[in-house]
Every structure is written in structure tokens, then in C-alpha cells.
Amino acid sequence: MTTERTGILLLVSGPSGSGKTTLCRRLADEDEAIYSTSCTTRPSRKGERDGHDYHFLTRETFEQKVTNGEFLEYAEVHGNLYGTLKTEVLDHLAKGIDVVMDIDVQGAAQVRSCADTSIKAALVDVFVMPHTEDELLKRLT
């Protein structure tokens, strides 16, 4: 009897400068997990690729996806919308692929409150903090 493994959703949150992005990128670089690709309405920056760094959407398209309930989490930051599509995460999990999300505390709360049973069953929640307040201040300056 073979049991198919379902992926894990590793939700990594913490304050800016805590090291969460470094942790997530390292996991993805070592092929331990897929780094989730967020959607955004901000313009792409030099060197960024659509579908790799972000899914670049118009505000209208993004807002329609919000209305349709397509986001696992989303927020507006500095006038731009950012969010993670449910289908992208669920598709990877169903294939047994682990997904890592680098997310702020508010976004993590949205993911935790998701009603989808597949998301809830796969969720591993990690909060990252630097060792000391001095270390956090050093990272932010």
C-alpha cells in the first residue's frame, strides 16, 4: 500500500529584519520547498520576471480576484496590492510539494483563518525573531 504525501505549507512570519526572507530563500535554494510567488499591482523592477519574482497584475484584475475569493491572503502596502493565490498553493500541496511563504504578521493571520481544510491540514506556522533587539536594529539600519 502506497501513501501519497501531501505537501506542507510552511508559513514563516516575523517583523521586518528578523531573517524570515533569508530562511525562506535558503529552503527554496536547497530544493526543500517551493517559494510562493505573490501577486502585486506594483510595476516590475529591473530584472524582475513575471511569474518568477511576482505575478504582475493590474489593479482591476487584482481586485476582481479579491472579489472572487481567489486569494489566500492579500494586503495593500504603500498604495500597491500584494497577495498569494489559493490555487497556486493548493496545486503544489496536492502534488506533494512543500510551499514556503515569507509573510508579515497580518498576512499570516489571514492564512491561519482560511477555511480551506487542505490549507489548515498542511499548515506549519513559524514565527522568526532575531536573538536580540540590538540584532534587529542592526538588520534594519
PLM features: residue spans?
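Walker A/P-loop
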Residues: T21
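ATP-dependent small-molecule kinase phosphotransfer cores
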Residues: S38-V99, V105-Q106
